[in-house]
Design a protein with these regions (language model features):
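Extracellular/luminal Protease-associated
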Residues: 75, 124-216, 401
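Active-site-adjacent substrate-binding region
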Residues: 252, 358-488
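Noncatalytic luminal/extracellular "stalk/propeptide" segments of secretory-pathway proteins
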Residues: 47, 54, 58-160
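Bacterial Sec-dependent signal peptides at the C-terminal "C-region" and cleavage site
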Residues: 15-25
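Soluble metallo-hydrolase cores and metallopeptidase-like ectodomains found primarily
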Residues: 35-37, 119-153, 207-283, 294-306
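Acidic/histidine-rich catalytic neighborhood of metal-dependent amide-processing enzymes
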Residues: 168-175, 179, 256, 278-375
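Second-shell loop/turn segments in exported
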Residues: 36-44, 62-76, 142, 164-177, ...
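C-terminal non-catalytic alpha-helical accessory regions
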Residues: 464-465, 473-716
């Protein structure tokens, strides 16, 4: 704080006299930053945001099913909503309104029912197969959690299986579905006994499927499941499942609806966005975000805001699901937008401010997830910028600014991976970045995500806060991307012991990373000084100096955007769904495999299973443990099959390469109770995996070391 104030004081001393500003021609008069923010805040109308969200969530014409809603990728309802949103953008005065068509797989849930002994039970589908119009009438079989072990001695061929599922503690619906198909079942119904849909015992839940269309797959309420299960011990129970679910591969179109406020220059732009496709009614997720984005646009227009750069408002389709037979089947509309429709937005977009569920008070605090390079920007805006709004009537502990890495669960990650600085309001994870907020256990992706969850104080704060953030980024002459955060990220990714075991050059890696710090610090100082001088000029009313500083900032903006794109292209990886530095995947796998070997050498398979086996390959070995090899073959083909590499979306070119330990994982689990057993075969598999992972580690470190050297030059 002292350094910031010192810079500001020096800038004030260096400013030309205020008299010169007073004598400037009238044509050059400019609104002060305070007046811009005051005008926006006065015009920001949370009730307008609510009205948009309410209509999107309750208008039956904007949903595919009158009973349970749903506005899926490429569906009639999604197209109707796109038309409505484009019309609303034009009505409030945005220019260049467009429905940008993007490819997707089409999913339209028209309806479903499940009848047992004359009683109909509500069900809701995933992006999976339909039944024939007359439905499937077959015996119902309960198979526990739906693992391969639950089918032992059970004949389910041609039958409807009923399972319990906890998609947070155990696995996604994909795996019980594929197991049921592998075992010959005709359809599967899943009751959420934990993880999601806990708000009520009749709650239904839908998610992306991360798999093929497979067999008809539906969510059923826990109470309904219990009623049906109670009948099973008394003899064969027949059920009739009818599913009208359109899933068309390669035949869908989703629309990303955009409008803009033209800036004084169109060289750069700022993007505000949310998504309008939904599971069920989707009031919070993500109708409220759409309302917020349009309310921000309307407030800027109504306040007479004239931005320096274009402000683009983009409402994405196909966020919840958009493609079959891929692990990365969500945020498809956004991925297509930045990679196919507008790749030129990379290097042009100063920031993408994304929104998810922005009208719910998740905790006593709020956060913003972002690229690490944006941590300083968010911290300085929140704690130092005099016009940053504070929460009123919500979030009593304020806005936390410790820095929270954006994750893969929202549209901003597709932009981030492509090279666009991106943020999203803190909507999912608690501040430990491990546990989710209770909303996700209870309401998320259920029919209970309705206007009853609305909190106007939260909507009003998020509208004012992020609208002010957009204005701040627009007005500052230099974009405050801080590559000392990238330095910290790379430094913290080093495990010197694993490097040494693998023959990777830890000293060289450390040296190159350390060489990144001085130019990163110097660039940060240049940016901070320029922006501080701009604030001082604004305070003094010196519009001539402000114009000069803005011109001086343009080369810095180009520099940091180029460096940011470079960082994500060469230094961002994914381990399943977790953002990493690429070498962290083999580094982590080596350590885990060595722990497992140590346990097996001690004849202690129980500890190996309890602590390590399931965590290899991020979490994928937990699936290998519980599901048939044929199921895992499908998982592997979706992620690493040569014929599916053009179907990975935000995982393209950054997905990790898994260790081949499935057979050993399954074997150790099945032998976990053995005492004094011979695990030589399993140990050999893990040792072979370590040898392969060491090669991967050396290759990754070599690439990263070279890339960091080039990054240093880009920052200098």
């Amino acid at each position: 704080m002292f350094i910031f104030l010192l810079i500001l004081f020096v800038c004030i001393l260096l400013l030309p006299s205020c008299a010169r500003a007073d004598e400037a021609p009238a044509a050059h008069q400019r609104r002060s930053l305070q007046s811009l923010h005051d005008a926006f805040s006065s015009a920001a109308n949370s009730q307008y945001a609510y009205s948009i969200a309410h209509r999107l969530a309750t208008d039956f014409h904007l949903h595919n099913n009158a009973t349970y809603g749903g506005r899926q990728a490429g569906s009639d309802a999604e197209h109707a909503a796109a038309d409505y949103l484009a019309d609303e953008m034009r009505r409030i005065g945005l220019s260049d309104v467009e429905k940008a068509a993007a490819k997707c797989d089409k999913w339209q849930f028209n309806g479903a029912s499940f009848t047992v002994n004359g009683k109909e039970y509500p069900v809701y589908t995933y992006a999976t197969a339909s039944t024939v119009p007359e439905g499937i009438t077959a015996p119902i079989v309960y198979v526990g959690r739906g693992t391969m072990y639950d089918y032992e001695g059970v004949d389910v061929k041609g039958k409807i299986v009923l399972v319990d599922i906890d998609q947070r503690a155990d696995w996604w619906i994909t795996y019980p579905m594929l197991e049921a198909e592998h075992q010959g079942a005709a359809a599967i119904l899943a009751a959420n006994v934990g993880g999601f849909g806990q708000v009520a015992d009749d709650a239904l839940n839908s998610q992306d499927i991360c798999g093929p269309t497979s067999i008809p797959t539906c969510s059923i309420g826990v109470r309904a499941s219990r009623e049906i299960r109670a009948q099973l011990p008394h003899g064969t129970v027949l059920g009739t499942l009818k599913v009208d679910n359109t899933v068309e591969i390669g035949k869908g179109t989703t629309y990303n609806v955009t409008g803009r406020i033209r800036g004084k220059s169109s060289e750069f732009q700022i993007l505000l966005g949310g998504h309008y496709d939904t599971h069920f009614w989707g009031f919070q997720d993500d109708c409220c975000a759409v309302g917020l984005v349009l309310a921000a646009a309307k407030a800027m227009l109504d306040s007479g805001f004239e931005p320096e750069n274009d402000i683009v408002f983009c409402l994405h389709g196909a966020e919840e699901w958009g493609s079959s037979y891929t692990q990365f089947d969500w945020t498809v509309g956004a991925w297509e937008m930045i990679n196919t429709l507008h790749p030129e937005w990379v290097g042009k977009t100063l920031a993408f401010l994304n929104f998810e569920l922005p009208a719910y008070e998740f905790a006593t605090y709020t956060t913003t997830y972002s690229a690490p390079e944006m941590f300083s920007l968010l911290r300085d805006f929140t704690t130092r910028y005099p016009y940053a709004p504070k929460p009123q009537g919500c979030f009593p502990d304020g806005v936390l600014t410790e820095g929270y890495q954006t994750y893969t669960y929202s549209d901003d990650f597709s932009y981030y991976a492509a090279g666009v600085p991106s943020t999203v309001n803190g909507f999912l994870l608690q501040k430990d970045m491990e546990h989710v907020h209770p909303f996700y256990i209870d309401y998320y992706h259920t029919q209970y995500d309705t206007p009853d969850t609305y909190n106007d104080a939260v909507m009003a704060f998020n509208l004012r806060y992020y609208g002010a953030l957009a204005i701040y980024i627009d007005q500052m002459p230099a974009l405050q991307l801080d590559f000392t955060a990238q330095y910290t990220r790379l430094k913290d990714a080093l495990d010197a012991d694993i490097f040494a075991q693998s023959g990777a050059d830890a000293a060289l890696y450390r040296s190159v990373v350390e060489s990144l710090l001085p130019p990163a610090q110097a660039l940060k100082t240049r940016i901070d000084t320029l922006n501080a001088c701009y604030l001082a000029a604004d305070e003094a009313g010196d519009i001539v100096e402000m114009a000069r500083l803005r011109q001086a900032g343009r080369p810095l903006i180009r520099k940091v955007l180029n460096a940011f794109r470079y960082c994500q292209k060469y230094l961002l990886g994914l381990m399943y769904e977790r953002p990493i530095v690429p070498h962290q995947a083999p580094q982590e796998t080596i350590a885990l495999c060595q722990h497992i070997i140590d346990c097996l050498v001690r004849h202690d398979p129980a500890t190996a299973v309890d602590q390590y086996v399931a965590t290899v390959n991020n979490c994928l070995e937990s699936y290998s443990i519980y599901f048939s090899p044929a199921v895992i073959d499908t998982l592997n083909d979706m992620n690493w099959g040569a014929g599916n590499q053009d179907n990975l979306y935000f995982g393209t070119n950054i997905n990790f390469d898994k260790a081949e330990v499935e057979e050993a994982s399954r074997s150790v689990y099945q032998r976990r109770a053995e005492i004094g057993g011979d695990f030589a075969k399993e140990i050999r598999v893990y040792r072979d995996a370590i040898d392969m992972e060491k090669k991967k580690l050396r290759a990754d470190v070599h690439k990263e070391t070279e890339a960091i050297g080039w990054l240093k030059d880009l920052l200098g």
